[in-house]
């Protein structure tokens, strides 16, 4: 039996609960658990200087795309950059897109070319 993307339950999101982003500083990633603890969306980053992070990659499983999950990951990562007084290099195309759509001064002033 084939499973379609629409048939995948969304767990807490489906029940109207807010999306909860977790930050694992040791692994340098932000995650959202999607279906209990089995599926997750992730944003990966690395320190590339003393106070510079590279926001490298955002991945949301196909079945969960288009539901605003990546936006929550991007916001959490950029808020982390602001709160920790860091600079950010945006390797990830999605985060580049997010900043263009949300050109907040506190984000823009922290971007590295």
UniProtKB/Swiss-Prot annotation:
Residues annotated as signal peptide: none
Family statement: Belongs to the NATD1 family.
Disulphides: none
Bilayer-crossing regions: none
The protein's name in its UniProt record: Protein NATD1
N-acetyltransferase domain segment(s): 22-112
Upper taxonomic lineage: Eukaryota, Metazoa, Chordata, Craniata, Vertebrata
InterPro entries linked: Acyl_CoA_acyltransferase, Gcn5-rel_NAT, GNAT_YJDJ
Alphabetical list of PROSITE patterns matching this protein: GNAT_YJDJ
């Amino acid at each position: 039996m084939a499973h379609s993307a629409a048939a995948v339950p969304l767990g807490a999101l489906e029940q109207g609960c807010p999306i909860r982003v977790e930050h694992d500083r040791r692994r340098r990633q932000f995650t959202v658990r999607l279906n209990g603890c089995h599926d997750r969306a992730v944003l990966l980053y690395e320190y590339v200087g003393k106070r510079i992070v590279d926001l490298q990659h955002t991945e949301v499983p196909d079945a969960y795309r288009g539901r605003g999950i990546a936006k929550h990951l991007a916001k959490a990562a950029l808020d982390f950059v602001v709160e920790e007084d860091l600079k950010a290099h945006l390797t990830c195309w999605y985060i580049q897109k997010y900043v263009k759509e949300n050109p907040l001064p506190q984000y823009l002033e922290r971007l590295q070319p």
